[in-house]
UniProtKB/Swiss-Prot annotation:
Listed name of the protein: Isoleucine--tRNA ligase
Extent of motif 'KMSKS' region: 594-598
Keyword ATP-binding listed: yes
Binding positions (ATP): K597
Gene: ileS
Enzyme Commission (EC) number: 6.1.1.5
Catalysed reactions listed for this entry: tRNA(Ile) + L-isoleucine + ATP = L-isoleucyl-tRNA(Ile) + AMP + diphosphate
Signal peptide: none
NCBIfam families with a match to the protein in the record: ileS
Entry keyword annotation includes Ligase: yes
GO CC terms in record: cytoplasm
InterPro entries in alphabetical order: aa-tRNA-synth_I_CS (IPR001412), aa-tRNA-synth_Ia (IPR002300), Anticodon_Ile_ABEc (IPR033709), Ile-tRNA-ligase (IPR002301), Ile-tRNA-ligase_type2 (IPR023586), M/V/L/I-tRNA-synth_anticd-bd (IPR013155), Rossmann-like_a/b/a_fold (IPR014729), tRNAsynth_Ia_anticodon-bd (IPR009080)
Length: 1047
């Protein structure tokens, strides 16, 4: 293995290795023989751009990690990627390319066939580019066989869902109030309305004159003046308290609790509440529409202009408590209107312009007409107040145009009838995290029928034909089925406009049936992926491999793809199509904002993956260590730290590989049984930690918690192996002879590192593949063809792990003590003292005494109970009257006096067991830690550091011998650095030259043999300096000049 970690060159080498050796293809063949299956369906990304967002990369890396892990776990994985290729985003992009301003231009100027071909070309080109990007970051999926919603087989399969809905009596054509984009000229379903903008709109209070009165008015509030021409009735809550308010000889009717706010907003100071009354008194009251003389549609609506009770639909958080209702432009208005038999007046065309029935306003854009409507109200004394409001308003998720609500005829699937089935199926699914279940459950409880039709061009054509003669509806379930009933030839391409020409024979009257012009909701396309992606004979394949074992996407897909899949599954299969759902977070910048080019905070993946400082695995590791379901904040500092961590992991394998190769170590000729007697306690500890981590990782991955896999494995290699175990065993590796002690250490390290390599391979496949090819004996073609390491329970030892954890805590306290005394860790000390509160801890510490000695860098360590600390300290307790008084009342003064006279004894007991007991005036008293302030002073010449289990004591002053050894170790550290600078291999010898201060010359001569053994120097010349590399070093305020030459 190269001694230096170079991410980019390593990754390019591995990409080439995978391609030249057809590793994915071999893996697929190898994996196909496994008995257990793991069916994964890729939530298809939308190819609106040739370069993936870094959030999409996170998504794909999570999927890749899980698929790689499941292969290692012995599952036959289905890893087909997908692309969601239809819909408005691509249409809008092509419209921009072609300079199209309105939908009719596509038909009249471009031609639907040309437009659809352009959309297809755009989708395929971007999908091809995305595929290259995904392969470049090591995503092992079947890229030669992706499913695409534009493929004819996919479209053909998808039709079966609509046919099934029809057969179940769920498919119908009806009128509902839906969001509509006037620019794209198509409807949007509720779940597509997820994007909002802060928009300034009018905020007006309008007076509707009560019929038959001279001066009584109902006051309504609206921010959509354009809906007033379509007003039919007014809604109230009959249980609210309403008021008649006198203003300028007019009586204004509004909710009592809203009077103050309305008057304030309207700037009216002089007003008087004449009377208050329950809303029920208003029910049935008739009014005169203020624009009846200029809006044609208002003629004939007089009998419907009444006040109706809408119950809790009317609130008092804003407005007047009276709500203007236009059933043609409001969903609640529509539902209430349906109950009372009110007509649906819808006055707006597909482009958001008023229809002729709007009278004066015909042809005008509804939002632009607002000011004209306000002026007309003002002229008719119907405007109480006009202002502005900035509020969150829904916009089209692709073109960003403000949406409008329209009552329009569309095709629906009646999923509201399936609510109970859907809720039941949600309970049968594993949700990770479990709040995903709550969120999607809340959606289902509010479910509305699924509007599946869209008035566009680039999409899956609805397979609905209607007979011209008898109106019979024929729903087709596949291409094969269409070919059996078609009078005309079925085109190769099932898209519009070619499918529009297919005529079907009516199965009732024998007449000609023509297809409806609509295409399907784009969420329908992806929602059928669980079966439509399986190609021909999908039903047979589904029986073999269904249901889906896992789907995973961002948390926004709880209302998107997961919801669509659930609906489709229950319609088609009477069950959820998936067994488990994993939700991941969004990718944000360091400030928690979404990443967009317009904000200047957008980072392209290549800025990391092609950066020589980072590379692909750095990005993958950083992404996968983020808690999967939480939002991640992109950070260059975090990437820097990840690179350092990856470098440590690389160096661990370099260390092991180097020494094992030097000693020609072959793990195949050994096993733990014949080496067991030579295992030291640190070896047993490592085996215990390794098997425990493997067990924990497997448990985590049962719930697809990839962040726990990534964090546990990297932490194990960095903290347990690199920073702890290798420190303990390094000298065993330096031993030139092949003694059993060394071989035992090698074997344990090899087994642990090989297993760790396999477990890390789903996270960092490039780095692990490179190491695997050099490090592992009897290797397979690729690390991805290995099997997960087994958990050997017999090696998990709680006792040893607790002992080592205690030794680490003691070492940490020792470091703190050294820092206080200014003694470097490299400088050995003669004695250290460890005093522990618990007898069990004392016993455990003595079991790992040699480890503690090493960690504290001391020649000897004394370990004992906490009472031993008294030899090195003075402690005393001072009374705390503030807590003694309330607890002991009349005994306070006596207890204070007792503490002052027995200060050390009280303090000693409280430190040892948390309390001190005494009898005062015949009453038992327990003095606790809150009753005293404990002051502690370590004896002169010593330094101590407390931790939660005891205290570590070190002598401040070090002997001359200890000082010399410390300086020599500092010199050795500099020499090791210089060896690296000269690229001297670990087994190569050097010639060493040292010029030291005159008073240190004798010291160096005394330590020459030690220096030679530690630096592999054949000769150490003191006094003169020469060599291939000469550097001056300042050590303890003294200058040393060191020269190193290759021997």
């Amino acid at each position: 293995m190269p001694s230096k970690f170079d991410p980019l060159s390593t990754e390019k080498e591995i990409l080439k290795f995978w391609e030249q050796n057809k590793i994915y293809e071999k893996l697929k063949e190898y994996n196909s023989k496994f008995e257990k299956k793991f069916l994964f369906i890729d939530g298809p990304p939308y190819p609106s751009s040739p370069i993936p967002h870094i959030g999409t990369v996170w998504n794909k890396v999570i999927k890749d990690c899980i698929l790689r892990y499941e292969r290692l776990a012995g599952f036959r994985t289905y890893d087909q990627p997908g692309y969601d290729t239809h819909g408005l985003p691509i249409e809008v992009a092509i419209e921009k390319q072609l300079g199209i301003q309105k939908k009719s231009d596509i038909i009249e100027k471009i031609g639907v066939d040309n437009f659809v071909n352009k959309c297809k070309e755009f989708a395929l080109n971007n999908a091809s580019s995305l595929t290259a990007n995904f392969k470049n970051i090591g995503i092992f999926m079947d890229w030669n066989n992706p499913y695409m919603t534009l493929h004819n087989d996919y479209i053909s399969n998808s039709w079966m869902l609509i046919k099934k809905a029809y057969e179940r009596g769920l498919l119908y054509k009806g009128v509902h109030v839906l969001h509509w984009c006037p620019r794209c000229e198509t409807t949007l379903a509720d779940y597509e309305v997820s994007e909002y903008k802060e928009i300034e709109d009018p905020s007006i209070y309008v007076k509707f004159k009560v019929k038959g009165s001279e001066n009584r008015y109902l006051v309504i509030w609206t921010t959509t003046p354009w809906t007033l021409p379509a007003n039919v009735f007014v809604m109230i809550n009959k249980d609210y308290e309403y008021a008649e308010v006198e203003v300028n000889n007019e009586i204004l009717i509004m909710a009592k609790d809203r009077v103050s706010d309305v008057m304030k907003e309207a700037g009216i100071k002089n007003y008087k509440i004449v009377r208050t009354f329950k809303g029920v008194e208003l029910v049935g009251l008739q009014y005169i529409h203020p624009l009846a003389d200029i809006v044609t549609a208002q003629k004939g609506l007089d009998n419907y202009h009444i006040v109706v009770d809408a119950g809790e639909e009317v609130t008092l958080t804003e407005g007047t408590g009276l709500v203007h209702s236009a059933p043609g432009h409001g969903d609640i208005d529509f539902e209430i209107g349906k109950k009372i038999g009110a007509p649906v007046v819808m006055l707006v065309n597909d482009r958001g312009e008023f229809l002729p029935e709007a009278g004066k306003y015909v042809g005008k854009n509804v939002r632009s007409a607002a000011e004209e409507i306000i002026n007309d109200l003002k002229q008719r004394n119907a405007l109480l107040h006009s202002g502005k409001v900035v509020h969150r308003y829904p916009v089209c998720w692709r073109c960003k145009t403000p949406l409008i609500l329209r009552a329009i005829e569309q095709w629906f699937i009646g999923v509201s009838k399936l609510k109970e089935e859907l809720l039941k199926e949600i309970d049968n699914v594993k949700w990770v995290p479990d709040w995903g279940k709550t969120r999607i459950g809340n959606m289902v409880r509010e479910i509305r029928d699924w509007v599946i039709s869209r008035q566009r061009f680039w999409g899956t054509p609805l397979p609905i034909w209607i007979c011209k003669n008898c109106g019979n509806i024929i729903v087709i379930g596949s291409r094969d089925e269409l070919e059996k009933v078609a009078i005309t030839k079925v085109p190769e391409d099932l898209h519009r406009p070619w499918i529009d020409k297919v005529v079907v024979r009516c199965n009732k009257c024998g007449g000609e049936a023509h297809r409806v012009p609509d295409v399907a909701d784009v969420w329908f396309d992806s929602g059928v992926a669980f079966f439509a992606s399986l190609g021909k004979d999908w039903e047979k394949k589904w029986k073999e491999i269904g249901p889906v074992d896992l789907v995973l996407e961002g948390h926004d897909q709880l209302r998107g793809w997961f919801f669509s899949l659930l609906r489709a599954g229950v319609i088609l299969l009477d069950r959820a199509p998936y067994n488990a759902v994993l939700v991941h977070g969004f990718m944000l910048d360091e400030q928690g904002r979404e990443m967009h080019k317009s904000l200047g905070n957008y980072v392209e993946p290549s800025q990391v993956t092609e950066n020589e400082k980072y590379g692909r695995d750095v990005l993958r590791l950083w992404l996968l260590r983020n808690t999967t379901w939480e939002d991640a904040k992109f950070s260059w500092k975090a990437l820097d730290q990840t690179k350092r961590d990856l470098n440590i992991i690389w160096n661990v394998y370099v260390f092991a590989s180097t020494y094992m190769n030097l000693d020609n170590f072959d793990p195949r000729i050994y096993n733990l049984d014949n080496l067991k007697q030579y295992l030291r306690i640190e070896d047993l500890w490592l085996l215990s930690r390794y098997n425990r981590v493997v067990k924990e990782v497997k448990e985590s991955m049962n719930d697809f918690k990839v962040h726990e896999l990534a964090n546990k494995m990297t932490s194990f290699i960095i903290d347990d192996i690199s920073r702890f175990y290798l420190r303990l065993v390094r000298k065993r590796a330096w031993n030139e002879s092949n003694d059993p002690d060394k071989i035992a250490m090698y074997y344990v390290l090899y087994e642990v590192l090989k297993g760790s390599l396999v477990l890390l391979s789903p996270v960092i496949p490039f780095t692990t593949e490179r190491i695997y090819q050099d490090f592992v004996v009897d290797k397979k073609d690729s690390v991805s063809m290995e099997s997960l390491p087994e958990v050997k329970e017999e090696f998990i030892n709680d006792k040893i792990e607790k002992e080592f954890e205690l030794s680490k805590e003691i070492a940490e306290a020792g470091l703190n003590a050294r820092a206080k005394a200014g003694i470097k860790l490299r400088w050995p000390i003669k004695n250290a003292y460890v005093f522990l509160v618990s007898d069990i801890d004392v016993e455990m510490a003595n079991n790992v005494k040699e480890v503690i000695k090493f960690l504290l860098n001391t020649k000897d360590v004394e370990i004992g109970g906490i009472e031993g600390y008294r030899r090195f300290s003075k402690i005393k307790a001072t009374p705390n009257r503030g807590t003694i008084g309330p607890d002991f009342k009349r005994l306070t003064n006596k207890i204070v006096e007792y503490i002052e006279n027995n200060s050390e004894k009280v303090a000693s007991d409280i430190i040892a067991k948390g309390y001190h007991e005494v009898v005062i005036e015949g009453e038992p008293v327990q003095i606790k830690v809150n009753h005293v302030n404990i002051l502690e002073e370590t004896e002169e010449g010593y330094i101590s550091a407390r931790f939660n289990k005891g205290v570590v004591v070190l002598k401040k002053e070090i002997s001359k011998e200890e000082e010399e050894e410390g300086i020599v170790r500092d010199i050795i550290r500099r020499i090791q650095f210089m060896r690296k600078q000269l690229n001297v291999q670990i087994n190569d010898y050097i010639l060493l030259y040292i010029k030291a201060p005159e008073e240190r010359t004798e010291m160096l001569k005394k330590w020459t043999d030690y220096i030679k053994s530690e630096t592999r120097a054949k000769e150490v010349i003191i006094g003169e300096v020469k060599g291939d590399l000469i550097l001056p070093w300042e050590i303890e305020d003294e200058e040393y000049i060191i020269g190193v030459s290759k021997s």
